[in-house]
């Protein structure tokens, strides 16, 4: 799927007697989280004043295409290319009545927007399975953008973020946060501040070209249980486990300090803070790491990486490394020798894009 800027937000197949078919395409970037994740899950951030997450949108994309059916054809087809799964319903009402779904994220978001008329909704993803780079969240934001264009709902990006968060919680049956959804919606590098009353995004005052030179992302394999690590930390915190609460407090403080180091282009301090964040995260939940993750980070560190940490809930998936730009070739070779796969990435500057024709 290829998207370029263009299209009109006024196209609505439900209101046009001339258009019987429309194609809407949306794409949204994934992200790497540099510090502070897990804290974005309500109400954890309320217990840690000043809590924030720091993340960067990257050029591994999730895609959503909607193709409307001819007038009178009420059938709804949901298709996922990346996991090779599809399902169909005779109508929207039939989809609402279904007891379970093969593609629950697609169905739950479609149910929120309540589109009129039949359509085929197709998704695809460049994120490897269980990568921990927010692939499902990017997918959800892309679906929201496409369905918003299709229905003329006129929702904001912040609305898409909260619809996506809630749909994911319904699907995985555990609490979810919002830090995974802001990079797909807005792109760039940002701090997601988490005060009482609701989160908000603040763009980092950082040279994105310079930061881009200093990031490496690698994939260490699919985790055994997606999303469970965050739930275990969440539950331990709510249950009053002092060690976990203290660990998240330090992670919160480190995230605030890392934001300052990045904005000051103090890369040495940024590396030290990322190492500290990763250390506290492993203490909170040792299963967040694996032997391959440890090997990849250790090998990269010996060859010029300043720091490395797992992305997302961990237990496998991706690792993000902060490096000296001159050491890139050595770091990438060390990652390969550890058995991991380097994923070429750039920083996405635009966030979700949607076009229709």
Regions found by a protein language model. Give the residues of each.
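Conserved catalytic cysteine-centered active-site region
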Residues: 115-122
């Amino acid at each position: 799927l290829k998207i370029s800027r263009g299209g009109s937000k006024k196209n609505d197949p439900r209101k046009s007697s001339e258009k019987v078919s429309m194609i809407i395409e949306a794409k949204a970037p994934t992200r790497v989280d540099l510090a502070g994740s897990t804290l974005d899950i309500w109400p954890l951030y309320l217990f840690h004043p000043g809590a924030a997450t720091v993340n960067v949108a990257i050029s591994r994309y999730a895609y959503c295409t909607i193709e409307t059916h001819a007038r009178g054809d009420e059938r709804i087809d949901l298709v996922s290319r990346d996991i090779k799964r599809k399902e169909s319903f005779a109508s929207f009402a039939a989809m609402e009545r279904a007891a379970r779904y093969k593609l629950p994220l697609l169905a739950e978001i479609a149910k929120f927007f309540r589109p009129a008329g039949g359509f085929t909704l197709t998704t695809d993803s460049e994120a490897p399975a269980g990568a921990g780079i927010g692939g499902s969240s990017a997918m959800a934001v892309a679906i929201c953008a496409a369905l918003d264009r299709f229905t003329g709902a006129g929702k904001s990006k912040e609305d898409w973020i909260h619809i996506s968060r809630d749909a994911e919680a319904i699907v995985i049956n555990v609490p979810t946060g919002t830090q995974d959804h802001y990079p797909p919606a807005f792109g760039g590098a940002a701090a997601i501040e988490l005060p009482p009353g609701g989160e908000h995004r603040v763009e980092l005052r950082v040279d994105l070209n310079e930061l881009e030179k200093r990031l490496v992302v690698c994939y260490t394999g699919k985790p055994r249980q997606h999303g469970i690590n965050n739930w275990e930390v969440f539950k331990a915190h709510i249950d009053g486990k002092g060690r976990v609460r203290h660990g998240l407090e330090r992670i919160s403080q480190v995230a605030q300090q890392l934001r300052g180091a990045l904005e000051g282009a103090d890369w040495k301090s940024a590396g030290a803070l990322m190492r500290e964040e990763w250390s506290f995260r492993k203490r909170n939940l040792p299963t967040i790491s694996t032997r391959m993750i440890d090997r990849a980070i250790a090998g990269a560190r010996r060859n010029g990486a300043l720091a490395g940490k797992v992305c997302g809930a961990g237990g496998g998936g991706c690792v993000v490394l902060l490096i000296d730009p001159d050491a890139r070739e050595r770091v990438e070779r060390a990652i390969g020798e550890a058995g991991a796969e380097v994923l070429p990435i750039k920083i996405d500057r635009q966030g979700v894009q949607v076009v229709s024709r």
